[in-house]
Structures are given as C-alpha cells and as structure tokens.
Amino acid sequence: MPAPADIQAATLNKFLAAWREGSAPDTMALWSDDFKQRLLPLSLGESSFRSRDQAALFYPGLVENLRNWELHIKEIVHDSARGTAAVYATSQADTPFSGEKWTNEYAIFLSFSEDGTKVCRLEEMMDSAFYQSFVPKFQRYLMGLGGLKK
C-alpha cells in the first residue's frame, strides 16, 4: 500500500527543489537503495534500467558541468493512490562546449518507496533530438576525449 499522500508530496517537492537547484547530492539523497532509472523513449536504445550505482556514475558529472541552470516545471500530476508522479518540464543551461546550450524537454515519471520518503524509480522521457546530439559529445568529454575550450 502506498504511503500517505502528504509524505509522497513532501518527497516530490524535495526532489523538484533539488532538480530546480541543480543539486546532484540533494537529488541522489532522495534515491532509495533499490533505485532504478531509465531513459525514454525506448528508440534511444536505452531500454534497460540503470541501478542506483550506475546512475550515480553519470548524473553528478552532468549536473556539475551545466552552468546557469534553469528548470521550468510546466505540469505535475501526483497519483498518490499508485505512489507515482509525472512531471513535464523544460530546462536550459550553458555547457562545456563553446556555443552549445543545453535545451531539453522532459516528462519524468517517478515511483515512491513504500514509506513515501524516497524515489525508487525514475523514467525520463527526453527530447530525443537533443539527446542524440548532446550525450555522445558529453560522454567523450567526461572520458577526457572531448575538448573543453577555455
């Protein structure tokens, strides 16, 4: 049985505040031990879920490299009876790549832990055109193969 709606809502508000602030530590503190994350649409080829440890390898590096981060939450749907929430948002930021902005559009789907205090599942529907353009460059950058112009 899902946790009470007010507990879930408090967790959702903390998650959204951490996302809005671009705080990887605060976001990850809300991930349950059995947290799993998946990128959507499935056409991106990312059909399997990442574990908490796998997601933690990429997420902090991404957040730390986005400057002047702005998140605009457009819609929130919280289904407390199912222990889930959906959020539609857009974001923009400066990236490590000269002349290239982060401009992304999301629909995220969260599931709460049984006690409602953690996020146990996160599915992120991303702008596939942006993802296919940005993510390979960023992965190379994180591996030290890309160039950062100073």
Curated annotation (Swiss-Prot):
Enzyme class of the recorded protein, top EC level: oxidoreductase
Pfam families given in the database record: SnoaL_2
Key words of the record: Monooxygenase, Oxidoreductase
Iron listed as a keyword: no
EC number(s) stated in the UniProt entry for this protein: 1.-.-.-
Biological or metabolic pathway of the protein: Secondary metabolite biosynthesis
Gene Ontology molecular functions: monooxygenase activity
Family classification: Belongs to the avfA family.
Task performed by this protein: Monooxygenase; part of the gene cluster that mediates the biosynthesis of the tetrahydroxanthone dimer neosartorin, which exhibits antibacterial activity. The two different monomeric units appear to be synthesized by the same set of enzymes, among which the Baeyer-Villiger monooxygenase nsrF is the key enzyme for the divergence of the biosynthetic routes. The pathway begins with the synthesis of atrochrysone thioester by the polyketide synthase nsrB. The atrochrysone carboxyl ACP thioesterase nsrC then breaks the thioester bond and releases the atrochrysone carboxylic acid from AacuL.
Protein name stated in the entry: Monooxygenase nsrS
Phylogenetic lineage: Eukaryota, Fungi, Dikarya, Ascomycota, Pezizomycotina
Gene: nsrS
